[in-house]
């Protein structure tokens, strides 16, 4: 068989036709001042990009006010403007004009809209800015969207993408890492970029995205607010035993010894006070690990015992900082003045003291959590006595960063480093995994004197710095405590706040002495989850800067009315709302669906998490009487015409235990799998419509009971004693139709 040969002319003609066809479909893009708008003439769609962030919007379509797609485009390009004329089914003119970091869109058909998709993955997150503040702090868990969220923040580039206030961003059903964006024009709309948002708008001088060494903030126990400087080995054994028994099954991991162990002339960070810790630090670390927990330690890395240093018989005199009179200075927060400040302008201090000491703590002792203290006051002292330093040409901030670089390099990426005793925020973004953001708190609600310690300090830090959490590091507002004289209601407010913001969760209570009711506050809020802030600004800040630079210990003007955690998880989309009463007497508190960014044209279930009570539904507002300093936590979920899981008994977010969930409309079965805590019962709280009735509950463990209420609430309680080899609880709730 002969193969027909194409002539050169035929081949050239074919290529020309192909090129003409491609050219007719692909319009030359409009490019101006960093913006790029590409037009696909065949599909009649737009793609919008910017040099700062790459792709902004794609597959953009034009729609008329009556929801008809506008087609038959005619394109006109000038140096600074793109114009699209549509001819079917309506004539209209659309202009796209860019000026610096703004894209302005105008249409001749008021009420028309643009519809497309925007990248919105883990690195480009839903956001709100300060002008949108309504007294509620919004946070997110999973790929969420809401009617009151009109911006996306691009974490890697520190760029805020602000759509118009009438824009509606909803998750794409086929790809939850994208947003469907609807931009209404009346007759104009603007898309704005705010570059260097944290750096310039918020004044965060050293902005750097949080390295992904850890996915969630740590959960643990700290000795300080139980025993302070008097902590002993016996105390640590007793608390470790209690933590392993009572809270380890619920997610607590770290047992952290705080300052105390270096007191005495012979004690240092490696050779502890023998009276208080007769078997030493390495033995205690091994004991903690033997209980399935992880050892953590407070260390002022800017100090060392002068008489008996850690890594030599005697350090050279030029290892230490001195004042103008030649005196040594006690390091911050250590047990006594035997630990003095080191002179890190001398590089030998890092090589011969810091690195060897930390290497022993990690590689020989098994350190996994470092509370890295003392640097704020060290910098102050260095600046005051710089002339006496080994190398006075070095500034305190330069030295500080060098020290922390050495700490990170020595400890590696598997040790959580939590900065402590900070001043200026951000010098060690990228090196710290987390940091304290404020002063010390105390297990009382109000301070006993002006500027005294109390849980008010905790709340100022938590709300004033939440915009940093899981963006640049994990924020540590200081420890959580619920013991007396704090009331049960105050304890609910404290644990609900930390759990719904996802900040570092370090408790400091005598766990084996807590009443069961208060212990349950910890159990139902541990572990932490990878929550991100939606509100990317310091909440109603009174003071958080010095000389224009963000400083520690933020003070807010007032605490928020509520925290609204928006969740996208196994159980679908829902809100976990903590509604606060900060008053000293019982008071009514309210919210509306519109305030939460929910659809006021729909109806929503309300489930009271702490009281395990169904509060009915709302399509507008809800009001409740809340006790003084108390919190009402509601799970809010859109009503559907089939059985819905509202909550579990395990965790305030309902995300920790639930692994799978499915409703089968053919067999009328709600089924799923859950992770349960051995020795603890596990409940599902389900709403069912009135036309369905439970016929059977099946599980791979004992079903303790199921109860139904007239309002539609169904509770099913299971034993946690699973069969040998079973990793999860598997369950089926089977219904049948009934006439109503």
Annotate each PLM feature.
Residues 620-654, 710-740:
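C-terminal beta-strand-rich structural cap/linker in extracellular carbohydrate-active enzymes
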Residues 10-20:
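Bacterial N-terminal signal peptides
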Residues 63-65, 120-131, 595-611, 687-701:
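Solvent-exposed beta-hairpin/edge-strand motifs
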Residues 29-251, 287, 369:
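Carbohydrate-recognition beta-sandwich/jelly-roll modules
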Residues 19-29:
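Bacterial Sec-dependent signal peptides at the C-terminal "C-region" and cleavage site
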Residues 498-501, 506, 542-598, 637, ...:
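Carbohydrate-binding surface patches
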Residues 217, 221, 225-355, 359, ...:
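Aromatic-lined carbohydrate-binding/catalytic grooves of carbohydrate-active enzymes
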Residues 312-339, 343-348, 398-516, 541-547, ...:
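Glycan-recognition surfaces
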């Amino acid at each position: 068989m002969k193969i027909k040969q194409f002539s050169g002319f035929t081949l050239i003609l074919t290529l020309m036709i192909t090129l003409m066809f491609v050219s007719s479909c692909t319009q030359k893009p409009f490019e101006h001042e960093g913006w790029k708008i590409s037009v696909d003439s065949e599909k009649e769609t737009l793609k919008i990009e910017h040099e700062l962030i790459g792709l902004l919007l794609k597959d953009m379509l034009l729609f008329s006010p009556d929801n008809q797609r506008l087609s038959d485009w005619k394109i006109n390009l000038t140096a600074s403007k793109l114009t699209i004329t549509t001819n079917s089914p309506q004539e209209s003119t659309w202009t796209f004009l860019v000026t610096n970091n703004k894209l302005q869109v105008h249409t001749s058909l008021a009420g028309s809209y643009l519809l497309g998709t925007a990248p919105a993955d883990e690195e480009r997150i839903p956001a709100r800015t300060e002008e949108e503040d309504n007294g509620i702090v919004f946070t997110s868990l999973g790929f969420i969207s809401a009617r009151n969220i009109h911006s996306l923040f691009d974490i890697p580039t520190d760029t805020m993408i602000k759509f118009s206030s009438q824009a509606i961003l909803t998750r794409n059903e086929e790809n939850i890492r994208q947003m469907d964006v609807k931009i209404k024009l009346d007759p104009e709309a603007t898309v704005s970029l705010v570059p260097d948002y944290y750096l310039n708008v918020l004044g965060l001088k050293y902005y750097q995205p949080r390295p992904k060494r850890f996915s969630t903030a740590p959960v643990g126990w700290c000795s300080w607010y139980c025993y302070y400087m008097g902590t002993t080995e016996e105390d640590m054994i007793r608390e470790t035993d209690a933590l392993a028994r009572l809270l380890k099954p619920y997610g607590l991991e770290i047992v952290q010894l705080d300052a105390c162990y270096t007191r005495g002339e012979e004690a240092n960070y490696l050779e502890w006070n023998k009276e208080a810790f007769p078997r030493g630090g390495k033995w205690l670390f091994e004991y903690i690990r033997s209980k399935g927990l992880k050892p953590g330690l407070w260390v002022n890395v800017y100090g060392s015992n002068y008489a008996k240093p850690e890594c030599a018989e005697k350090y050279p005199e030029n290892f230490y900082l001195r004042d103008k009179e030649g005196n040594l200075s006690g390091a911050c927060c250590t047990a006594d003045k035997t630990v003095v400040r080191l002179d890190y302008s001398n590089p030998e201090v890092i090589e011969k003291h810091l690195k060897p000491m930390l290497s022993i703590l990690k590689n020989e002792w098994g350190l996994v959590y470092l509370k890295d203290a003392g640097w704020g006051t060290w910098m102050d002292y260095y600046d005051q006595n710089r002339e006496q330093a080994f190398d006075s040409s070095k500034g305190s901030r330069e030295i500080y960063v060098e020290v922390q670089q050495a700490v990170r390099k020595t400890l590696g990426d598997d040790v959580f480093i939590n900065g402590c005793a900070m001043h200026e925020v951000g010098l060690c973004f990228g090196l710290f995994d987390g940091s304290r953001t404020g002063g010390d708190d105390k297990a009382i609600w109000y301070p006993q004197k002006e500027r005294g310690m109390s849980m008010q300090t905790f709340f100022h830090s938590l709300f004033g710095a939440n915009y940093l959490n899981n963006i640049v590091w994990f924020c540590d507002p200081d420890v959580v405590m619920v013991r007396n004289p704090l009331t049960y209601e105050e304890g609910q407010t404290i644990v609900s706040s930390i759990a719904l913001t996802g900040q570092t969760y370090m408790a400091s209570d005598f766990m084996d002495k807590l009443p069961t009711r208060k212990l349950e506050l910890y159990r139902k809020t541990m572990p932490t989850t990878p929550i991100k802030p939606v509100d990317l600004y310091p909440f109603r800040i009174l003071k958080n800067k010095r000389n224009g630079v963000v400083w520690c210990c933020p003070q807010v003007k007032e605490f928020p009315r509520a925290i609204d955690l928006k969740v996208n998880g196994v159980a679908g989309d829902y809100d976990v709302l903590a509604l606060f009463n900060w008053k000293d007497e019982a008071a009514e508190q309210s919210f509306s669906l519109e305030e939460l960014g929910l659809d006021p044209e729909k109806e929503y279930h309300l489930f009271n998490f702490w009281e395990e009570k169904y509060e009915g539904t709302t399509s507008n507002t809800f009001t409740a009487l809340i006790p003084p300093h108390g919190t009402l936590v509601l799970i809010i979920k859109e009503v559907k015409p089939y059985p819905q899981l509202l909550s579990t008994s395990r965790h305030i977010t309902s995300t920790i235990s639930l692994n799978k969930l499915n409703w089968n409309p053919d067999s009328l079965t709600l089924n799923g799998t859950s992770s349960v805590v051995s020795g603890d019962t596990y409940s599902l709280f389900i709403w069912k419509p009135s036309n369905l009735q439970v016929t059977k509950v099946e599980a791979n463990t004992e079903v303790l009971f199921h109860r139904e209420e007239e309002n539609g609430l169904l509770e099913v309680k299971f034993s946690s004693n699973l069969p040998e080899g079973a990793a999860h609880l598997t369950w089926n709730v089977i219904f049948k139709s009934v006439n109503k």
